[in-house]
């Protein structure tokens, strides 16, 4: 599809037309009246004579790009429709998609769950999203780093450590005064049992925070939780390249340098504490960077972290957050614009909604603070990783995921994961029994005239564009949508056409070439999603 966009831009330049290049120029269309690619470019042009302009665009295409198109015409709705030539389709059948290496570095901040417990169901969607975004960017030729931001500096980390300390106090029969936001449960008790020889006194939270051993104790607790978190992520095949600690950023950040970075834009002001003018970006109030006691706020350390990201020379920053951080997004964009000054680094924040599980139409409940969570082990006992990845990535980021476990565990076409995997296995089966002569490289594909075949050829043309769009926008559900649609088209094609026909070797060779290309891209997306690709089912 990129070649259609490029041809259209060349045409617009040749005809000296002006248009809004922020809008999508071309879309894949499948309906009863047309099966191909369509453009609304006419409505984006700064001209009142749409009909005349449309005629000139069609005339230019038919004169200058006839090798690429079987037909270019104006539809009743004034859209310009493109039917691809078989000569162009052939390119997609004899060459597998190849993505050139790009000199662009991407940092993906993902998971970043507070080190106050194990990974739970809500984190899994974020973990899968960051993992797949990382895989996709690598496939497209980008250099990537997937990073976990460890919040080990603030109040929450102290409360968690104190909860471990109180578990030790209880073991030694010391009366405790429970912190109102304290943690309890298996993780707290497990960490306490691993450091049970640590000496404890009758300390309340304020006294605990003033002890000389606080930093050492906090680091110890954090490392033990991170060990559990890494183990959890390994179980779902999510691997982090880099771990950045909030405490380390605070230690090495010269906040005077940070202020110098913000000064040129006059984004901050002093009023007892140091404030950033986040209201400029629609925030309901300005936010504190440095408190009156000179300690950095949670937001302040996050700003320092993003300055450090910029200093490492990344071109694109992707932050994968949960919607519990939604209020943080506007202020982060404000801070980033103030920080980056003349650099061209871009920041994109993806906020992912919650995940819920349903069994027998009833909600499976969870509660992290009470220690009663749906852990990785529990999740994997209820649903396969393949199904979990599919269902958590198959909807818009802002949609609450509601996984019906009864459907997710079905071994039939009602389960979309099974449906796609079965299509892949069936493709393999057909290719496996084809003889070598039938699988030779073809020089023509004009016998592929069935409507399903045209739709599948268009899928091949659309594929590279879809991948790039999914990566840039974070709309990873485009991947699962594409897979399901391709599988559906394939199953329909399989029913109406004999793909491997001994009585028509020429047609069979062309159909098998199409099948081989489809099998390649289906496997490529499943690999990006880290969903298994069974050879037979």
Swiss-Prot record:
Biological process annotations from GO: arginyl-tRNA aminoacylation
Lineage: Bacteria, Bacillati, Mycoplasmatota, Mycoplasmoidales, Mycoplasmoidaceae
Manganese recorded as keyword: no
Species the sequence originates in: Mycoplasma genitalium (strain ATCC 33530 / DSM 19775 / NCTC 10195 / G37) (Mycoplasmoides genitalium)
NCBIfam families: argS
GO molecular function, a single term: arginine-tRNA ligase activity
Gene: argS
Location within or outside the cell: Cytoplasm
Quaternary data: Monomer.
Protein name in the entry: Arginine--tRNA ligase
């Amino acid at each position: 599809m990129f070649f259609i966009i490029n041809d259209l831009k060349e045409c617009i330049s040749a005809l000296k037309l002006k248009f809004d290049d922020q809008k999508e120029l071309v879309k894949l269309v499948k309906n009863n009246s047309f099966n191909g690619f369509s453009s609304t470019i006419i409505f984006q042009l700064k001209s009142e004579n749409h009909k005349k302009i449309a005629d000139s665009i069609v005339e230019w295409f038919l004169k200058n790009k006839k090798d690429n198109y079987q037909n270019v015409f104006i539809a009743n709705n004034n859209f310009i429709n493109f039917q691809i030539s078989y000569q162009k389709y052939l390119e997609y059948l004899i060459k597998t998609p190849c993505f050139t290496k790009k000199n662009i570095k991407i940092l993906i901040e993902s998971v970043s769950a507070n080190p106050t417990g194990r990974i739970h169901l809500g984190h899994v969607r974020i973990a899968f999203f960051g993992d797949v975004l990382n895989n996709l960017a690598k496939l497209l030729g980008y250099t990537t780093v997937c990073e976990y931001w460890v919040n080990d500096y603030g109040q929450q980390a102290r409360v968690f450590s104190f909860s471990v300390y109180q578990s030790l106090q209880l073991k030694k029969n010391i009366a405790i005064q429970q912190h109102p936001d304290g943690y309890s449960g298996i993780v707290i008790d497990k960490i306490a049992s691993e450091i049970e020889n640590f000496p404890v006194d009758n300390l309340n939270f304020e006294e605990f925070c003033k002890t000389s051993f606080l930093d050492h104790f906090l680091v110890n607790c954090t490392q033990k939780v991170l060990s559990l978190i890494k183990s959890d992520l390994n179980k779902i095949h999510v691997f982090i390249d880099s771990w950045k600690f909030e405490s380390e950023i605070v230690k090495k950040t010269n906040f005077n340098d940070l202020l110098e970075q913000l000064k040129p834009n006059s984004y901050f002001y002093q009023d007892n504490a140091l404030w950033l003018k986040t209201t400029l970006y629609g925030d309901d109030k300005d936010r504190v960077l440095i408190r009156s006691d000179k300690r950095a706020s949670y937001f302040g350390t996050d700003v320092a972290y993003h300055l450090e990201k910029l200093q490492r020379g990344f071109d694109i920053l992707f932050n994968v957050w949960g919607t519990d951080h939604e209020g943080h997004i506007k202020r982060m964009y404000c801070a980033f614009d103030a920080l980056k000054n003349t650099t061209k680094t871009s920041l994109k924040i993806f906020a992912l909604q919650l995940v819920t599980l349903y069994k027998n139409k009833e909600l499976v409940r969870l509660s992290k603070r009470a220690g009663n969570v749906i852990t990785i082990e529990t999740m994997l006992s209820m649903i396969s990783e393949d199904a979990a990845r599919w269902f958590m990535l198959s909807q818009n980021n802002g949609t609450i995921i509601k996984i019906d476990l009864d459907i997710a565990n079905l071994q039939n076409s009602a389960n979309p994961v099974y449906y796609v995997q079965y299509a892949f296995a069936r493709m393999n089966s057909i290719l496996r029994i084809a003889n070598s002569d039938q699988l030779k490289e073809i020089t023509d594909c004009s016998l592929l005239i069935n409507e399903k075949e045209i739709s599948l050829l268009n899928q091949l043309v659309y594929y590279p564009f879809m991948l790039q769009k999914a990566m840039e926008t974070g709309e990873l559900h485009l991947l699962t949508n594409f897979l399901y649609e391709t599988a559906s088209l394939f199953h329909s094609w399989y029913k109406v056409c004999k793909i491997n026909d001994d009585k028509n070797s020429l047609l069979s060779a062309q159909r098998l070439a199409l099948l081989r290309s489809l099998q390649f891209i289906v496997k490529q997306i499943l690999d990006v999603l880290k969903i298994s690709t069974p050879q037979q089912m």
